[in-house]
């Protein structure tokens, strides 16, 4: 099962505290309508802090949602709960080792919530784990960028991103 992380248009967060929930609810309704119109019924949709997350096993979700007005970006990710930074590192190595073979790479991490580690800690340790499979690290001009997002106790390993319309 994949998780799709949807970032809303930059106009929505600028709305007042009374108007913003209305726009966000409309965006959620539009996304659900688009999914149902395409025959996608197996999904779970949640919204938290301006980020919409859809869990679904259907591969068409990203292509459908990116065409909904108000969607800025859609990212397809593998998601899992974790107990420690070691869980994040071992799964990242398993997922991304084939992506970096013979290429220079960089690891980019975004983090939200309270943790005993920083984004840089994750990036450094994942980079260290992937280094043996790659041609090296190049932070300014990498061949491959490994994107990871951590929100509370869930880690998202970004596989692909689409810009919205």
Give the ranges of each region predicted by the language model.
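RNA-binding accessory domains that recognize and position tRNA/RNA substrates
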Residues: 1-165
């Amino acid at each position: 099962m994949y998780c799709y992380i949807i970032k809303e248009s930059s106009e929505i967060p600028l709305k007042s505290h009374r108007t913003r929930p209305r726009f966000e609810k409309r965006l959620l309704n539009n996304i659900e309508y688009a999914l149902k119109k395409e025959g996608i019924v197996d999904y779970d949709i949640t919204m938290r802090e301006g980020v919409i997350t859809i869990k679904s096993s259907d591969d068409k979700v990203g292509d459908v949602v990116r065409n909904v007005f108000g969607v800025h970006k859609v990212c397809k990710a593998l998601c899992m709960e974790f107990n420690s930074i070691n869980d994040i590192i071992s799964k990242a190595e398993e997922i991304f080792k084939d992506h970096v073979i013979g290429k220079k790479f960089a690891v980019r991490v975004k983090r939200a919530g309270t943790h005993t580690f920083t984004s840089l800690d994750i990036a450094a340790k994942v980079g260290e784990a992937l280094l043996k499979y790659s041609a090296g690290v190049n932070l300014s001009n990498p061949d491959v960028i490994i994107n990871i997002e951590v929100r509370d106790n869930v880690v998202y390993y970004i596989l692909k991103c689409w810009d919205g319309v």
